[in-house]
Amino acid sequence: MPFKPVAEAFASMERITSRTQLTLLLTRLFKSTPPGAIGIVVYLIQGKLGPDWKGLPELGVGEKLLVKAIALAYKATEERVERLYKSVGDLGSVAERLSREYRSRAARAVTLEAFMAGGGEALTVRRVYNTLYRIAMAQGEGSRDIKLRLLAGLLADAEPVEAKYIVRFVEGRLRVGVGDATVLDALAMAFGGGAHARPVIERAYNLRADLGYIAEVVAREGVDALRGVKPQVGVPIRPMLAERGRDPAEILRKVGGRAVVEYKYDGERAQIHKKDGEVYIYSRRLENITRMFPDVVEMARKGLKAGEAIVEGEIVAVDPDNYEIQPFQVLMQRKRKHDIHRVMREVPVAVFLFDALYVDGEDLTSKPLPERRRRLKEIVVETPLWRLAESIETSDPEELWTFFLKAIEEGAEGVMVKAVHRDSVYTAGVRGWLWVKLKRDYKSEMMDTVDLVVVGAFYGRGKRGGKLSSLLMAAYDPDRDVFPTVCKVATGFTDEELDRMNEMLKKHIIPRKHPRVESRIEPDVWVEPALVAEILGAELTLSPMHTCCLNTVRPGVGISIRFPRFIRWRDDKSPEDATTTHELLEMYKRQLRRVEEPAEQV
């Protein structure tokens, strides 16, 4: 399949703000894509070479090398490329302009670089992908020159619009405004006959978190082929998500009256896969984090009595002397890429297991929670550092509250309340009332922290002048696949955290508002939705400045957080895992009820 129609689709997507129109455009693109190429097209739309859990290396092409490649491809000087970049602010547009200016496919000479990348023929989707893959896989001595030749050759053969989006892909700034939810909608329209097919496609994706694979199966064999998709060891399952609650009696009513209540540990949620002697560990974001936890690998080898298993648990840092639970920040030292065995000794961990999703060929995701817990108990060999999560089963709000206080006292951040009725299946990738989290009271009107996405930033004044020192934060609206703003956060940062924040933001700054962001506020810099932070505030309030739940409570206003304060970064969460607009609306309504209750009693 030629790459040009894909690049032209990217150009159209960039101009479209309506999710409906985006879905229709994607539907047309998918229908015109051969089944053998559709997986690659989906990966390119996602801006990646494959699912995160595969752990493929990054392309490793910095800005300077990209400038060199553009200059080499179009016989321009690097100084000219840099001048244009400073003027335009986008290397993709620079490549498009130079390609149009210096090349046409009929007149282009075959350079050494073009020969290295394939010889001057029209670009195909597969050639673009394969070349980008080769660039990523080029490692070690001489890899910089290999990357330069491959990329310059690809750009030399690219038409202007193709060059623009190849460069943006390499930069990691594709910016076409399409999330996974929109891709699923389009696959349902293209190959399932309409929206009624989406639940089947989405469930398959939730069980086999590889959107390219799902697209290829549905394109080749139809929606019915996806009904048979089951968990597979080595392929992470998208995690089941919980709603949040505050009142024990209300929570028990929501889950059906009786529930299992477990400690909610302040650590890294982990999905642990075992097949024979091999063990893989995946984060909440489905990233392969096996390297960080060689001790957990050994625990799983010895502590799971099954040939094949997929279990879920929480990895927490513990005190090496007494095994008491340590704060989440201590665990984050495990993210170091070097000296992991030394860090392992300094920061030992414990694993608290709470679910079994697959055991020896049996898919347990369709089984109710009591059966999954029974299977988990059967296969786990407990030790002080590898054990089942602390839990009770109850229908009594008082007992739930007492257990909650005990959890807080013992270092947990709250409890998870889980339904036990016959429909208490594992709803992969779905947030619902089968699980409800009850977290600690932070002694403020806003009873819980929220996880919000950075979409913009502002420069500070005084001693913080010249540095980005406050953030524009957004929630996630899953119905529309967008990020409406909630608040501006300027407090809670230490000087060290500000320095780290500025480094983190560098690679995510973009020249204009991201297509999936809704904002009435113009920050000093726009940031692509990628970073998630935990925020605590005094209360939820109505705001004419923010777009979260706009026009929902009252015309013309949204919901905002008063006196927001930064708590910590949530590296374990993707933007789509952030607190949703539905959750914020529910929190606001509960807050109103608390305020109104005393007046009603008078």
UniProtKB/Swiss-Prot annotation:
Its cofactor is Mg(2+); Mn(2+). One of its GO terms (molecular function) is ATP binding. It is an enzyme of class 6 (ligase). The active site is at K264 (n6-amp-lysine intermediate). Its EC number is 6.5.1.7. It catalyses: ATP + (deoxyribonucleotide)n-3'-hydroxyl + 5'-phospho-(deoxyribonucleotide)m = (deoxyribonucleotide)n+m + AMP + diphosphate; ADP + (deoxyribonucleotide)n-3'-hydroxyl + 5'-phospho-(deoxyribonucleotide)m = (deoxyribonucleotide)n+m + AMP + phosphate; GTP + (deoxyribonucleotide)n-3'-hydroxyl + 5'-phospho-(deoxyribonucleotide)m = (deoxyribonucleotide)n+m + GMP + diphosphate. Inhibited in the presence of 100 mM KCl, NaCl or NH(4)Cl. One of its GO terms (biological process) is lagging strand elongation. Optimum temperature is 70 degrees Celsius. Optimum pH is 7.5. It comes from the Archaea. InterPro entries: ATP-dep_DNA_ligase, DNA_ligae_ATP-dep_bac/arc, DNA_ligase_ATP-dep, DNA_ligase_ATP-dep_C, DNA_ligase_ATP-dep_cent, DNA_ligase_ATP-dep_CS, DNA_ligase_ATP-dep_N, DNA_ligase_N_sf. ATP binds at E262, R269, R284, E314, F354, R431, K437. Coiled coil: none annotated. Keywords: ATP-binding, Cell cycle, Cell division, DNA damage, DNA recombination, DNA repair, DNA replication, Ligase, Magnesium, Manganese, Metal-binding, Nucleotide-binding. Less active with Ca(2+) or Co(2+). Not active with Cu(2+), Zn(2+), Sr(2+) or Ni(2+). DNA ligase that seals nicks in double-stranded DNA during DNA replication, DNA recombination and DNA repair. Can also use ADP, but not NAD(+). Belongs to the ATP-dependent DNA ligase family. Monomer. This is DNA ligase. It comes from Aeropyrum pernix (strain ATCC 700893 / DSM 11879 / JCM 9820 / NBRC 100138 / K1). The lineage of its organism: Archaea, Thermoproteota, Thermoprotei, Desulfurococcales, Desulfurococcaceae.
